[in-house]
Amino acid sequence: MDLIEQNQQYPYFLMPGATTLGMVFSEGVMLASEKRVTYGSFVTSKAGKKVFRITDHIGAACAGLVSDMQILIREVEAYSNLFELDVSRKISVRSAAKVMSNLLFGRRLFPLITQTIIGGMDDDGPSIYVLDVLGSVIPDKYAAVGTGAEIAVGVLEENYTEDMNLQQAKDLAIRAMKSGISRDSMSGNGIDLLVFMKEGMSEESVKF
């Protein structure tokens, strides 16, 4: 049975949509995702949360099944806290990304259906990493994942500069997210922003 036949027989066995992005800017890291949660063609929630705090200096933005995102983030958060208790220092962004990679690869036969951008601030400065469902870890300066990613990453590609300040990064993130949402029926209903800087973490929701 091919995928088309499967989807005809099980019309709701479909990948959920999302538009999610992350970027490094001069003062820190910006993560963003929209709020719509879909089940097939039905919008199950207009207030889904797809950006997550892992520690005070690391967070993640995800696209995929919300339940799988939540399980993955809880496990990475637990390992990060255990690391800090064990060695009396905070886990680095790179190490947290590797922990997430190992968890995803360990589930490769029954994968967690989520693409993830993990990022934050540590002693090496701001950084982000992109992970697929099998745990591949790709460092980058900016990235977008999800069904609206092709449109969003085009806006980032055209306008991104690493020396952007916080306001410029926020404006670009919102612009890229709105562009992705405008062409993706499975994304929408506002944007959640998560920012990590030396001064700490901040969250913001943008309605439109």
Pin down the residues of each PLM region.
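Long, low-complexity N-terminal extensions
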Residues: M1-F208
